[in-house]
Amino acid sequence: MGIVSPESGAAALKALDKAMTDYRDDAYDVLVNCPVEDSNIHIEGYKFTGISKYIETCLGEGNKASTLYISDNLRLMVAAERASVKDIANVLTKDLVKEKATLLFKTIRRDFNISNPRIAVLSLNPTAQGKEEQEIILPAIKEMEEDSVQAFGPYTAEEFFENGYYDQFDGILALYYDQGVPPLKALATGSVVKFNANLPIIATEPDCHTRFDIAGQCIADASSLRHAIYTAIDIYRNRKRYDEPLQNPLPKLYREKHDDGEKVRFSIPKKKHE
């Protein structure tokens, strides 16, 4: 107990595989997983890089998972979440910023019951006046405005977190991990939960390590796991509430105009005796 072993890795993989199978069989509604030691899980022909990527591969249906960090009233997503620091400037594009900010907007609207969320986009450079801000971030924000996505910025991370600007927004898009996640954790008064956004399955997990050093001592804090469970339940209810009215929309009434072919809504022809 309290050490990494082949048996514990095999047991973790067996539990994950069972969870994937049971979800396909509609055996449960949400998945809450505990931390696992990634290096201890070995799958022939597949490199295990984390639970999020594994769930994406098994149940993503072609969608790419994006981690949403949740703490108190803060929700943060990372644009270049899998890129190393030295590659961030090369990975960052207008399409990536727009894609991630729009995903964050739609996720908060659907899964957190906020009808028109406000998204803050952080800058790459300390002055927010660099080439990346002028040629990538600002054009992306402009295009999102035209698509009715409420995105604002770019804000420097120091100014944004130091002055408490985060209180004015429903979601935050950081450009890389160290820019956003450490400040979020520092500001958190409780535990942080990770949610795998953009997947059909609702999957959450506490943002903590395996802590083999305290295994079996009954001193672990269960609040983070409890928070992950409650968050998954809330997201399930919000998503169901959001999707239900969209299941059977009323059909639109159109009539073709003979002169120019444009469709006119709700244009009902008069009766002959009128």
For each predicted feature, which ranges?
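Anion-binding alpha/beta catalytic cores of soluble intermediary-metabolism enzymes, centered on
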Residues: 1-274
